[in-house]
């Protein structure tokens, strides 16, 4: 590189030679006009000029900024309840500024001035403190002199008064007075010495405790400081936080904490200790150092509260009433074997056990005070009069219950029932020789257990129909159990006596094994032989019912507000919720306000079992009522009340309580079945949307379908209800991939449109047998297939040949079945499988063939296996899929 002289450099940078020489001189470089300039000299000059214009020179950058980025993913729950991932980027910046030498010098001067000012302030404060102390000492001495002079003056006056009194006293009185004075002075001196000694001991004890506590705190603080420093060394500090700032914050925190503890430590000393410490030579020496603090907390006894527990309560609310943390309640319940969460609803029994376990007194609260008040505020002052018996007809399927009742009512109802089977409860009343009897007909199918149980609870007498040619069947035994559980007398009607070869004694023997003993055998059960087809024995059966009712002496008040029970309920298109009610007491009138389970309403219309409008109904009369707010559950009690507003409040309270109890039961079931739910990914589900004509059918079908569930396939009722199939039901089925089942109901136009567009599976049924069978078939189709291996051929190895292309070729004789080229094989030696694979070649007379039958010779090449020996057996098999059924 060519050298540059001063003149050329001045021309390049656009300045004069004299000015450039002057700048070189200021930078400490001596140059002449014609001398050359090196690169180092140029750098020195540039550095000098940069400093002159406020720069930092070439020592390094004046300011340096460090940036740090960290990215992470945060899971956030949106408004729809679904979790989504959000990218979070954290940026941290720290800036370093380089101080010049001049700034450093100014900083040093400033620090020196501050230090000098601080020393002057300290000296001034010390001087003021000394002056204040001298002033206080002078005031103290003056006060002591004044007190001493006052005491001497008082003593002088007391001596003068005493001498004056002594002059007036007798010698005996004077001696006694002097003795009392000496005794008083001695007692006062002893009291002062005892108080002083006690104060000294207390001061020593406090000093010793303070010293021990100070040592403990010092060791603890030292340990905490070491741990903090260790954490700081291992942790990654924020780049903008300096070490000095962190240390200053730690010192400030420690000072604040110390001040807080000192403030808590200060307590007012007892009056006698103050007095003892303000006397004598130990004056002012009993004050303990205020900078020390103790860490001892006085132990407190557990607070035992009275906890009021309602029927359902959340864990958080229970913890609040016990004045403990929710985590403590959760921990206690875990120890008791219940896995709960803080917001979970638990029942009254569980809450009572937890509260008693934690040592609290439990008060059980009944929240149905309004309900009891409304139900008690009823007029039931009517005189009881004889009423008609309520008779329930029970029996097994197709044993003739409905036919027997039809003959009594002289109306054919059984032919109208689908499949000749009673699908839901029917209630009728008939007149027999001037006496009225109300009959309840119950289904005999196994699915309708709950309906039969409700029928037994609402009845006075049970007629058990048993077919003479069929004998005692499962539902017959169940009916006996229901009647016994309800405490209802039985009348046995042995039906189908018109058939040839029937044996009624067989029925008696079988029922006798169930402890249903006939009257002629010494029991209390009436047996009547009947035929629903010819009418044989029907009059005797009705006579037996009337005789039994006379023995029971059935009475009920006919005047007053009515009460009854819901036999059945349904949703009628055009009329709304319809409930069949059996009146048990009082008179039910049109316009009455009825509280019916979870529903309420004013009766808009009443109809009897024949569909005729009526205005009132007395005891033992079944009626249909319209006007309820919803569909009540079969078996609910129906009660007439005065106030519609209070009836609404009670119904809403019952709905809330039912919801809470149901939620608690579901949560408990979820937790108990936690481990079984872990494997639900392998379980197939058949989703069903079920609609039926009456509530009882919904219960029966849901129960039957749920019982079909197995470990591999489960039936899930995703939706159910009373009434026709609506567009909402079809949409639900489409969303949950369910089949739509209608039992005695049909889909409306909008629902059919959705079903066609979504290509849903819609099925109508009128007999419960068909419904259960078809759902069972659908479940069978979802079972995992089962595979079975079948041996189709067996070949004996007679000789082994070697092939350059394939390897070992087994010359075989087919001894059983067929050897197929495409089938898998096993090689057996001494009846032990030594290889499993497939055929590579199958030839007969050098021709490739597809199969070789029994009794023929062939050559077999086993793929990837050359250890075939004479005497081995080659077994050919195929895998067959077997269709599984439930």
Curated annotation (Swiss-Prot):
Family: Belongs to the TRAFAC class translation factor GTPase superfamily. Classic translation factor GTPase family. IF-2 subfamily.
One GO CC term, this protein: cytosol
UniProt region (Disordered), positions on chain: 46-91, 121-297
The organism's taxonomic lineage, starting at the top: Bacteria, Pseudomonadati, Pseudomonadota, Gammaproteobacteria, Alteromonadales
Function: One of the essential components for the initiation of protein synthesis. Protects formylmethionyl-tRNA from spontaneous hydrolysis and promotes its binding to the 30S ribosomal subunits. Also involved in the hydrolysis of GTP during the formation of the 70S ribosomal complex.
Gene Ontology MF terms in the entry: GTP binding; GTPase activity; guanosine tetraphosphate binding; translation initiation factor activity
Domain of life: Bacteria
Database matches in Pfam families: EF-G_D2, GTP_EFTU, GTP_EFTU_D2, IF-2, IF2_assoc, IF2_N
Keyword RNA-binding: no
Segments of this protein annotated with the region G1: 395-402
Chief location of this protein within or outside the cell: cytoplasm
Segments for region (G3): 441-444
Sequence segments annotated as region (G4): 495-498
Location(s) in or outside the cell: Cytoplasm
Region annotated G2, chain positions: 420-424
Record key words, sorted: Cytoplasm, GTP-binding, Initiation factor, Nucleotide-binding, Protein biosynthesis
Organism: Pseudoalteromonas translucida (strain TAC 125)
Residues the entry annotates as binding GTP: 395-402, 441-445, 495-498
Compositional bias ranges of the Basic and acidic residues kind: 130-163, 175-239, 246-260
Domain tr-type G, chain residue ranges per copy: 386-555
Protein's name according to its UniProt entry: Translation initiation factor IF-2
Start and end residues of each stretch annotated as G5: 531-533
Bias kind Polar residues: ranges: 72-82
UniProt feature coiled coil, ranges: none
